[in-house]
């Protein structure tokens, strides 16, 4: 251990610790309005909307993640449900403009509200809600808090409600939409402790959700060391294209993962150096990772929080 008992260099984070790990880094906060939304077909039967690089506002309904759907011969799978009841309702309406096939599955990729609070909009379809085996506990711990924050920003009528997975993936799982198989992987602690990725067998496209950020700075709410391991796991899957959780609708996997791991490695290495040099966290949040500033949108909003999370993880290595 690098710190003596009863002594800590990150006293400014004590308030955060009292929340028992609640994700303050991904809670909606006020920001700029959303850009115009549209769905584009990025592969045969795969429709994706790009979310703006912004925070939740009353104007954008927390519609800030990349969401969409996949059409099989028999049914439709929702890749991400959206950031609010209003966002999910928008997506459901867009699906119905394109197909009358039943919506059989809705994927809940992780606990953060911009990815799962649209799920209630699909209730009347009675879909299977697919999620990581640890998602239920994460929603129990945070769901009502997130709902309350969304209600403050959007209003209770647009915020949505907590929806739990009905298919919990422990390791891997498959879903058949009729001539179209989706393969799921439950990951170890990384972006969160309940990250689920998916791959479309027909196109080979990977859906890593927030295990992959492009342009928008990654937000750390799980394990920094674990995220680097899971990034290697994503590489090993062999996909050449992916739909990231944030960023362009479709990206080349290799360079996108290179950018992600460069930032995470910088965060890890510079945090370790700060800890070894007894740098207080108040100073570390101002210096660690600054070489990455011009490479990421929302850097000033999230990098300091990432440094705080990294300190909490790495201080006791």
Predicted segments with their positions:
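C-terminal segment of N-terminal export signals and the immediately downstream linker at the start
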Residues: 16, 29-50
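Active-site HxH/HxHxD metal-binding segment of metal-dependent hydrolases
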Residues: 93-168, 174, 193, 269
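Active-site neighborhood of phospho(di)ester-bond hydrolases with catalytic His/Asp-centered motifs
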Residues: 79-81, 105-110, 130-132, 207-209, ...
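Core dinuclear metal-dependent hydrolase active-site scaffold
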Residues: 168-200
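Divalent-metal (often Zn2+) His-rich catalytic cores of metallo-beta-lactamase-fold enzymes
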Residues: 228-279, 287
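Conserved beta-strand hairpin/beta-sheet module of binuclear metal-dependent hydrolase folds
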Residues: 41-94, 196-208
């Amino acid at each position: 251990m690098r710190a003596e008992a009863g002594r800590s260099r990150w006293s400014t984070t004590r308030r955060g610790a009292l929340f028992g790990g609640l994700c303050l880094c991904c809670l909606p906060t006020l920001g700029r309005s959303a850009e115009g939304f549209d769905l584009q077909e990025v592969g045969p039967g795969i429709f994706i909307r790009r979310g703006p690089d912004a925070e939740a506002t009353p104007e954008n309904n927390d519609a800030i993640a990349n969401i969409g759907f996949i059409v099989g011969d028999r049914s439709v799978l929702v890749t991400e449900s959206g950031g609010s009841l209003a966002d999910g309702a928008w997506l459901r309406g867009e699906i119905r403009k394109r197909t009358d096939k039943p919506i059989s599955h809705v994927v809940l990729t992780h606990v953060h509200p911009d990815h799962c609070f649209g799920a209630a909009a699909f209730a009347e379809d009675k879909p299977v809600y697919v999620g990581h085996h640890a998602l239920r506990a994460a929603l129990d711990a945070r769901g009502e808090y997130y709902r309350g924050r969304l209600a403050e920003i959007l209003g209770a009528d647009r915020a949505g409600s907590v929806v739990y997975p009905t298919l919990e993936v422990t390791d891997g799982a498959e879903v058949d939409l009729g001539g179209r198989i989706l393969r799921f992987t439950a990951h170890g602690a990384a972006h969160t402790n309940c990250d689920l990725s998916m791959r479309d067998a027909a196109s080979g496209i990977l859906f890593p959700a927030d295990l992959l950020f492009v342009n928008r700075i990654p937000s750390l709410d799980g394990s920094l060391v674990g995220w680097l391991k899971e990034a290697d796991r994503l590489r090993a899957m062999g996909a050449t294209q992916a739909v990231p959780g944030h960023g362009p609708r479709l990206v080349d996997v290799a360079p996108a993962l290179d950018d992600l791991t460069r930032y995470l490695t910088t965060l890890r290495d510079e945090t370790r150096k700060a800890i070894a040099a007894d740098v207080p966290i108040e100073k570390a949040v101002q210096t660690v990772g600054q070489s990455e500033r011009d490479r990421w949108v929302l850097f000033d909003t999230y990098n300091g929080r990432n440094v705080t999370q990294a300190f909490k993880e790495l201080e006791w290595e």
